[in-house]
């Protein structure tokens, strides 16, 4: 998407009273400018539309989520697998807009249902409180009462 054109069009439409849900790439500056002109929903891509590549830059997408906690974020484009949809939810995004993944699936109805089920499972797992990510190994088993321990 054209950043300048999208920002300019969004600003004009917002002034006319429209609610604008702009499609963007994963550039945080682009997102920030859209928010500055008044957009309440931003729809960054996971990867270029129709490619099915998934989330090619998870760090950028996470930074967008972390930077704009009060903005509704809907990932739009690039989803190709059910696991991609789960990643989006795990990043804290509010939703997913997908078309190509369903429309081009061999069994679209089955794929759509699978995405729905996976997203519900990802949401449920987040509510269950997954463990924190650590850069070092942390055993979860006690050594108390184990043979050969000093």
Predicted features along the sequence, with ranges:
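Alpha/beta enzyme core
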Residues: 1-150
């Amino acid at each position: 998407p054209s950043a300048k054109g999208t920002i300019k069009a969004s600003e004009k439409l917002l002034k006319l009273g429209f609610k604008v849900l702009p499609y963007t790439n994963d550039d945080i500056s682009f997102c920030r400018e859209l928010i500055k002109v008044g957009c309440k929903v931003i729809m960054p891509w996971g990867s270029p539309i129709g490619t099915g590549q998934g989330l090619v830059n998870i760090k950028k997408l996470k930074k967008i989520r972390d930077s704009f906690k009060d903005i509704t974020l809907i990932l739009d484009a690039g989803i190709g697998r059910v696991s991609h949809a789960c990643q989006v939810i795990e990043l804290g995004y509010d939703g997913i807009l997908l078309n190509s993944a369903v429309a081009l699936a061999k069994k679209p109805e089955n794929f759509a249902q699978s995405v729905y089920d996976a997203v519900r499972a990802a949401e449920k797992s987040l509510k269950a409180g997954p463990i924190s990510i650590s850069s070092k190994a942390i055993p979860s088993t006690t050594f108390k009462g184990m043979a050969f321990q000093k």
